[in-house]
Amino acid sequence: MKGYLKLEDGSIFEGELISKNKKGYGEVVFTTGMTGYQEAITDPSYAGQIVVMTYPLIGNYGINKYDFQSEKPHIRGFVVREYCDKPSNFQSEESLLSYLDNHNIPVLSGIDTRALTKKLRENGTMRGIITYNPEDNIEFDQTNLLEEVSTKKPYRIAGIGPKLAFIDLGTKKGILKMLNSVGFDIYVFPYNASYDDVMQINPDAIFLSNGPGDPKDAVDAIELTKHFIGMKPVLGICLGHQIIALALGCNTVKMKFGHRGANQPVKDLLTNKDYITSQNHGYAVEEESIDKDKITVTHINLNDGTVEGIMHKFLPVFSVQYHPEACPGPRDSTDIFDKFMDIVMVYKRRFYFAEV
């Protein structure tokens, strides 16, 4: 049946509603990956958003059991130029549409995604609605996205190495797998875990995950991070990067249209190397707010010059805006997990010998 994407500025894009669910509200964003739609729709960082795929043909390899980044999709809607209803892949177990229908996600096909993406680039991300009735009003909900995507109770992923307190702000499975693969004994905590909660395991290091929304809303995680800076090694990715920056006294700002996709170029200012990275964020650390006497900018985005990584000059604290674990995307910078392990082991040995 005929369907529409209506934006908050009144713009309407017409297409075909191909899903069982005919209505969905959310912030309309675009992602530029040619592949990786399964990872994108199950990435908790997309919670509360209607995702527009810029690549024109989506669904051609179906859905498999290996590429999920969480237990369910977190998007509010899915928009494509053309949907492939006959997937072909040896791992495919069901079609993309079948999967989204099973989770009540509205899907709009036949949209001029090129024109839509251009509009979002020029005017910024907007709230919108997928609907069968263009007269419908756009709703604005106040859902606590962190509560929606974070684990409800602590759990452990056993490893042979140092104990890592992992603050789940809406993590992707790929991050947990990478940290566990380098040896961390991971204890996962909810987004609102307290200092006392975390200290029950006496961790060797702290990790802050990716996640959705405005980093300034993550008040509990910011306060927790302040406690551990200078006390334990700390690493953050994506939202975790922004939270570390806020805990260090920096500011974050909402971007015009964000970075979403598996092809974002980043320069490592310490090594002068360039990487192609996977990203998914709508906020950035404001460079002007960084105290350069204490904090070094380690990475920048080559498209717009925004901050992609920071490191404290005197403390074992660093973070990156991009996703080094990829899922989907290039694995140019997976060595960050080994680097973190090295820092934690050095820090741990130093305190061991100090106690002896």
UniProtKB/Swiss-Prot annotation:
Reaction catalyzed: hydrogencarbonate + L-glutamine + 2 ATP + H2O = carbamoyl phosphate + L-glutamate + 2 ADP + phosphate + 2 H(+)
Positions that bind L-glutamine: S45, G211, G213, L239, Q242, N280, G282, Y283
PROSITE patterns hit by this protein: GATASE_TYPE_1
GO process annotations (BP): 'de novo' pyrimidine nucleobase biosynthetic process; 'de novo' UMP biosynthetic process; glutamine metabolic process; L-arginine biosynthetic process
Molecular-function GO term, any one: ATP binding
Keyword Ligase: yes
Pathway the protein acts in: Amino-acid biosynthesis; L-arginine biosynthesis; carbamoyl phosphate from bicarbonate: step 1/1; Pyrimidine metabolism; UMP biosynthesis via de novo pathway; (S)-dihydroorotate from bicarbonate: step 1/3
All copies of domain Glutamine amidotransferase type-1, residue ranges: 163-350
CDD domains: GATase1_CPSase
InterPro entries found in the cross-reference section: Anth_synth/Amidotransfase (IPR050472), CarbamoylP_synth_ssu (IPR006274), CarbamoylP_synth_ssu_N (IPR002474), CarbP_synth_ssu_N_sf (IPR036480), Class_I_gatase-like (IPR029062), CPSase_GATase1 (IPR035686), GATASE (IPR017926)
Active site, renumbered: C238 (nucleophile), H323, E325
Keywords from the UniProt entry: Amino-acid biosynthesis, Arginine biosynthesis, ATP-binding, Glutamine amidotransferase, Ligase, Nucleotide-binding, Pyrimidine biosynthesis
Highest taxon of the lineage: Bacteria
Family, per entry: Belongs to the CarA family.
Record note on quaternary structure: Composed of two chains; the small (or glutamine) chain promotes the hydrolysis of glutamine to ammonia, which is used by the large (or ammonia) chain to synthesize carbamoyl phosphate. Tetramer of heterodimers (alpha,beta)4.
PANTHER family for the chain: CARBAMOYL-PHOSPHATE SYNTHASE SMALL CHAIN, MULTIFUNCTIONAL TRYPTOPHAN BIOSYNTHESIS PROTEIN-RELATED
NCBIfam families: CPSaseIIsmall (TIGR01368), PRK12838.1 (NF009475)
Protein name: Carbamoyl phosphate synthase small chain
Organism: Caldanaerobacter subterraneus subsp. tengcongensis (strain DSM 15242 / JCM 11007 / NBRC 100824 / MB4) (Thermoanaerobacter tengcongensis)
